[in-house]
């Protein structure tokens, strides 16, 4: 009987490992471009802090021939007793040609502090040229701007802050497949955790965010992180 149990456990582990390999191959075979977002025109998310609605995050997908521009707007306001404690507003534009990244620009206002970043391609070596409020210089074109709508970010060794241009080295862990219910709709999702690879960073600078993508479409469904409160982005509508 013990031999049968042992054999069953070994067979189970082999099947489990095989399923993980199949998942990785099927999930990431198309990660090179953003062509699989061809059917998306508009995405809108509600932003919650401690389960209280405080703002929104919107994406407009604008196409012209082989060019795609993704225009984003984020706004939220934390208030207490009728007083504004924290106000945030950001606008950005991300540009692609034939599904390949070309440029990114954003302006952000955090209370009275202004931040910005402009990212372009170096035509000599295809590296990224960053001009931001936190970083100015060049970096690898394998790094990706930290706009969560694009699931390519799961395979990047580092992301670039879409607010200030800061380069954030990351470790991405696949947590598992999960069903996520938002409103009256249930999504079959792939759950990932993103953490800063550099443990020497101060806590305020460390990345530790959970992201859920719809399994079939790679639609960004939800984000969550815990920093001065529990924050969530939940999808509201998309077409």
Language-model segment annotations:
Residues 9-17:
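Bacterial N-terminal signal peptides that target proteins for export
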